[in-house]
Curated annotation (Swiss-Prot):
Molecular function in Gene Ontology: structural constituent of cuticle
Keywords annotated in UniProt: Cuticle
Name the UniProt record assigns to this protein: Cuticle protein 16 isoform D
Source species of the chain: Limulus polyphemus
Amino acid sequence: EIFPFNVPEGKNDPAFLQNLQQEALNYINQQQVPNLEKHKAEELKVAAKERAAYNAGYY
């Protein structure tokens, strides 16, 4: 079945679904980055150089 139809409860609640989707994306991102802390440090290093282009709310 396709998301969100395999969600037992809350499938008619947009906020619930959005939160679930965000949790799933966060999980996937963590699987793709072997060392999350190192990755964040690199992001911050880039952010320091490009302050204007960086959205602090991303992490």
